């Protein structure tokens, strides 16, 4: 019985108590189940009675007594005790904890995933870097975290659409085209333009396809370098991200919104709802009505739409495509966007608390030997995803970028993340999987079943076995927490803890017989436990987009 199973049993018991007239509360969809904070207080605990007491207009211990009576006879539960003000402490039946191993192996790749779809469509926008240069190190973090979050949300039962918003309209694109043209003509690139070897490479590629480029009038040549340079840069960005294992369901074009008249339609909708006004020759949105520090212009006095107007049109476009929740993963320099996006959501009649989630991430730096790594040879003034992958590989890069909370800055030690020692987290987790795979290959060579349906899991009573079983049982709740709190790092930290628990189990509990020993029932039970651990490690690494090697 996993914590998720126990939570379901508690919810069912609440439902029965309500149906019987013993409790007058709204039946929750889920409840908290955790390990007891004090040893000897059972296998799991729940504060559900304390949480329901106010709504039930009963003392917590009275609510606990109502639930304990219904749960004590539940299959897999040996006893239910009431502690303190009303905590429920559960002791599982002899084989109930061991059954977790069998549950994991039976479920395989689906273990930890939601049993059924939630019926909620989520749009997850991430990276969305300007297509004016290679994918930067900061964008690499959003790529790793965003892709992992998409996988985790999918596992948690959401229907997820990953999206890259291409900022292919505006001044920065004009400057990029001018920079490529200057490089092609052998002229000095404007100070406000884009610099670095990659600009010269793109210019050479454009020239190769258009040898007549420099014979064209300046405006025509600029149009060519802008369009073809943009296409080449986008091709490189796509290739880089695909090589990093990052998938997008849609590449959305800002320019396409302009062309389709989406900005005008957004303004019309907002005006019809009374949130738009005209002043000083410009068109404004009353964002201060919804928590912004000042109203924002949609159209400037020169008649040109603002970036904010495009943001509003893009929000409307996403909701119009049927997405229930919109998640924006933005960089540290976008703090000001939070209030603006919430105001946009509210102006369109949505509830920002329900329909919108803006996640702000902090920056990444690299170091080697204690010294900062400051510059890319190709990009010139900034580090790129390509630089990072070249230095450490895809697995180490993705894992290292994901394992820390986004709200903290990240300094990646290139020496550490390539070290094959236990102080390197990605090696530590991957090595646990490889170590298990080696053990299971040896078991198969001895003719031993590695996932026997008849294994006697009631024999798994050693403290290290119990710790490992409890750890495996936590995985579904870890996925749920990582999804609801938008924190893929929770999966990484869980895997590191699980790997440590496994290594301690391996050191304390011999799995395979040695010498002339005969394999007994305990061998089969431990092999099932080991196989279950491999499933969870592989599933968890897969959610982070990291491989689970069979050999290291």
Swiss-Prot record:
It is found in: Cytoplasm. One of its GO terms (molecular function) is ATP binding. Keywords: Aminoacyl-tRNA synthetase, ATP-binding, Cytoplasm, Ligase, Nucleotide-binding, Protein biosynthesis. A motif ('HIGH' region) lies at residues 129-139. GO terms for biological process: arginyl-tRNA aminoacylation. It is an enzyme of class 6 (ligase). It catalyses: tRNA(Arg) + L-arginine + ATP = L-arginyl-tRNA(Arg) + AMP + diphosphate. Its EC number is 6.1.1.19. One of its GO terms (cellular component) is cytoplasm. SMART domains: Arg_tRNA_synt_N (SM01016), DALR_1 (SM00836). It comes from the Bacteria. InterPro entries: Arg-tRNA-ligase, Arg-tRNA-synth_N, Arg-tRNA-synth_N_sf, ArgRS_core, DALR_anticod-bd, Rossmann-like_a/b/a_fold, tRNAsynth_Ia_anticodon-bd. SUPFAM superfamilies: Anticodon-binding domain of a subclass of class I aminoacyl-tRNA synthetases (SSF47323), Arginyl-tRNA synthetase (ArgRS), N-terminal 'additional' domain (SSF55190), Nucleotidylyl transferase (SSF52374). Monomer. Belongs to the class-I aminoacyl-tRNA synthetase family. This is Arginine--tRNA ligase. It comes from Frankia alni (strain DSM 45986 / CECT 9034 / ACN14a).
């Amino acid at each position: 019985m996993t914590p998720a199973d126990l939570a379901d049993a508690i919810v069912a018991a609440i439902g029965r108590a309500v149906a019987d007239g013993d409790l007058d509360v709204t039946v929750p969809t889920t409840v908290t189940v955790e390990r007891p904070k004090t040893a000897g207080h059972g296998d799991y605990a729940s504060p559900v009675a304390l949480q329901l007491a106010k709504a039930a207009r009963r003392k917590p211990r009275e609510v606990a007594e109502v639930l304990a009576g219904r749960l004590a006879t539940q299959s897999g539960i040996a006893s239910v005790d009431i502690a303190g003000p009303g905590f429920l402490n559960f002791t599982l039946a002899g084989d109930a904890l061991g059954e977790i191993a069998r549950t994991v192996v039976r479920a395989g790749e689906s273990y930890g995933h939601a049993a059924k779809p939630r019926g909620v469509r989520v749009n997850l926008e991430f990276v969305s870097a300007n297509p004016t240069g290679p994918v930067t190190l900061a964008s690499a973090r959003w790529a790793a975290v965003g892709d992992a979050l998409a996988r985790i949300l999918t596992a948690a039962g959401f229907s997820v659409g990953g999206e890259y918003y291409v900022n292919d309209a505006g001044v920065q694109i004009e400057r990029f085209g001018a920079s490529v043209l200057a490089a092609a003509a052998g002229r000095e690139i404007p100070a406000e333009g884009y610099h670095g070897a990659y600009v010269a490479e793109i210019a050479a590629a454009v020239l190769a396809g258009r040898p007549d480029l420099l014979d064209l009038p300046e405006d025509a040549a600029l149009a060519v370098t802008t369009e073809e340079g943009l296409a080449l840069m986008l091709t490189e960005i796509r290739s880089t991200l695909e090589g990093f294992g990052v998938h997008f369901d849609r590449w959305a074009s800002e320019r396409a919104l302009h062309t389709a008249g989406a900005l005008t339609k957004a303004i019309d909708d907002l005006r019809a709802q009374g949130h738009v006004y005209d002043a000083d020759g410009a068109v404004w949105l009353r964002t201060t009505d919804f928590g912004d520090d000042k109203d924002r212009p949609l159209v400037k006095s020169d008649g040109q739409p603002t970036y904010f107007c495009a943001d509003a049109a893009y929000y409307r476009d996403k909701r119009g495509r049927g997405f229930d929740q919109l998640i924006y993963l933005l960089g540290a320099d976008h703090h000001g966007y939070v209030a603006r996006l919430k105001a946009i959501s509210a102006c369109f009649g949505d509830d920002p608390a329900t329909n919108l989630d803006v996640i702000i991430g902090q920056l990444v730096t690299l170091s080697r030997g204690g010294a900062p790594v400051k510059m890319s040879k190709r990009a010139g003034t900034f580090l790129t995803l390509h630089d990072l992958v070249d230095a450490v590989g895809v697995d180490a890069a993705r894992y290292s970028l994901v394992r820390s909370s986004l709200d903290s800055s990240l300094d990646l030690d290139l020496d550490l993340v390539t070290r094959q020692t236990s102080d390197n987290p990605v090696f530590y987790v991957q090595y646990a999987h490889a170590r298990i795979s080696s053990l299971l290959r040896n078991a198969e060579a001895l003719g031993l079943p590695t996932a026997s349906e008849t294994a006697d899991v009631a024999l798994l009573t050693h403290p290290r076995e119990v710790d490992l079983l409890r750890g495996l049982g936590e995985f579904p709740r870890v996925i749920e927490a990582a999804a609801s709190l938008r924190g893929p790092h929770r999966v990484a930290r869980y895997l590191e803890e699980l790997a440590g628990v496994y290594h301690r189990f391996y050191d304390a509990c011999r799995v395979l017989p040695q010498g002339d020993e005969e394999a007994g029932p305990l061998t089969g039970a431990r092999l099932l436990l080991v196989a279950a651990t491999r499933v969870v490690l592989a599933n968890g690494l897969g959610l982070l987009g990291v491989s689970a090697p069979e050999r290291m």
